[in-house]
A protein has these predicted regions:
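Conserved Rossmann-like nucleotide-binding pocket used by diverse enzymes
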Residues: 13, 116, 147
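Canonical P-loop GTPase G-domain recognition
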Residues: 122-173
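Conserved C-terminal guanine-recognition region of P-loop GTPase G domains, centered on the G4
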Residues: 76-88, 92-144
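Structural signal for conserved beta-strand scaffold positions within catalytic alpha/beta enzyme cores
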Residues: 35-37, 91, 148
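Nucleotide-state-sensitive switch-loop elements of NTP-binding domains
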Residues: 1-87, 98-100, 109
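Short acidic active-site motifs
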Residues: 22, 104, 156
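Residue-level signature of catalytic and energy-coupling elements of molecular machines
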Residues: 16, 71, 118, 133, ...
């Protein structure tokens, strides 16, 4: 968020089953935040849908925003199956999850425009082959942009921010 705050007015719809912990982490970082809890007393929804997002959009001053990021409830199954009105879909896929996830959960991987292959800083300790992760993603989505990143160290994040910049500029035309 800090990287983009000076360039674009950003809004975030933060989807979680319960709590405002993630939204609180983003508070004060230059973005408008709209919290969307799906909890219903029985565990909550495992995804967001368009009506939920529409309600959350009411909490943002859209006329003043260049980009709205929707963080869906986090798993690799449900979110891919529900249209939330997005113009592009990104996902975070961590090297700690194993390279088999694109084959086990192909719907999500087929649906995305960009894959952030996160926790790349752990590769030396996990003894994993990044090329294998990329190849598995390519099996189910040959056109997705794949960006190896480390949110912790910042490695590769410039590429992600460049992707977002190109998206925002391209969407404005």
């Amino acid at each position: 968020m800090d990287e983009l705050a000076g360039e674009f007015a950003v809004g975030v719809i933060e989807g979680d089953i319960a709590t405002d912990l993630d939204a609180a982490k983003l508070g004060g970082r230059g973005a408008q935040i709209s919290l969307l809890n799906t909890g219903n007393g029985f565990g909550g929804e495992c995804h967001l849908d368009a009506p939920m997002v529409n309600r959350a959009l009411q909490g943002l001053d859209l006329a003043r925003l260049d980009l709205v990021i929707i963080e869906n409830v986090g798993n690799l199954v449900c979110p891919a199956e529900f249209d939330v009105g997005e113009h592009a879909k990104a996902m975070v896929y961590s090297v700690t999850e194993g390279d088999d996830k694109p084959l086990k959960y192909p719907v999500m991987f087929r649906a995305v425009d960009v894959v952030l292959l996160n926790k790349i800083d752990l590769v030396p300790y996990l003894e994993v082959d990044v090329d294998s992760y990329v190849a598995r993603v390519r099996e189910v989505n040959p056109t997705a942009t794949i960006l190896p990143v480390s949110a912790r160290t910042g490695v590769g994040m410039a590429d992600w921010f460049d992707w977002l910049r190109q998206f925002v500029v391209g969407s404005a035309t």
